[in-house]
Amino acid sequence: MGWFEGVKSPKLKSSKKTASSTPHGLWKKCNSCGEILQTEKLKDTRQVCPYCDHHFRLSAVDRVSLLMDKDSFKLTGQNLTTTNPLKFNDKKSYDVRLEEALGKTGLNDGTLCGIGKIHGDEVSLGVMNFQFMGGSMGVVTGEKIAWVMDQAYEKKIPAIVVCCSGGARMQEGILSLMQMVKTSASRQRLKNAGIPFISVLTDPTTGGVAASFAMLGDVNIAEPKALIGFAGPRVIEQSIRQTL
């Protein structure tokens, strides 16, 4: 046997320590300028990029906390839930989609409404939540938006709705389209009574919501660079077969 036969070379061990994984949610990338931002610092700027002024989408709960005086907002209508009147099914049943949206947001529907105060002045407020099925307007959302305006009418206080929606909820068919008329009628009653309605247009505000109450404010306020219109660019491109 030779001198070095049967001799095994020792395996080299790396001196590098395994890098610990970065906890999820510490950083967020700006969709506009591409900067990597600390989530905690974004809270200080109210979810606005300090480099390019891009406005990140906010949940309905976050918007309420930003707008309302502390502990002044009295939520209502949380027990309202939609059904599946058309027994709608596509890739998933409507019932399954509702359960998934509930699990994702913790809300029974895509709109929060209630009475609260802004700098001491009482207002009737509705806030739409894009995280719940794209903020689409179904029967429950239509009922809540109408409630916001009806409460403003009864209490003689301003109505404010923060719009954030892809439009009418297709899973509810004609019942969702009826909400366009319902909400517009409630808004008209406010106008006749001389009670102000402020519509805040955030990204995105499109479809049946844009074609109804969202554009009917005495004052319409839009976030910078928000997508606002009846049809979004993807729908238009698919319709005309051209790139915008």
Regions found by a protein language model. Give the residues of each.
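Cys/His-rich microdomains that often coordinate metals
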Residues: 36-37, 55-56
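Conserved catalytic cores of soluble enzyme domains
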Residues: 163-244
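Cleft-lining beta-strand/loop regions that shape enzyme active-site pockets
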Residues: 110-191, 198
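Long, charge-dense tracts
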Residues: 4-5
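Residues immediately within or flanking Cys/His clusters that coordinate Zn2+
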Residues: 27, 46
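Short cysteine-rich clusters marking metal-coordination/redox-active sites
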Residues: 30-33, 49-52
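An N-cap/entry alpha-helix motif that binds or orients negatively charged groups
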Residues: 11-20, 28-29, 56-113
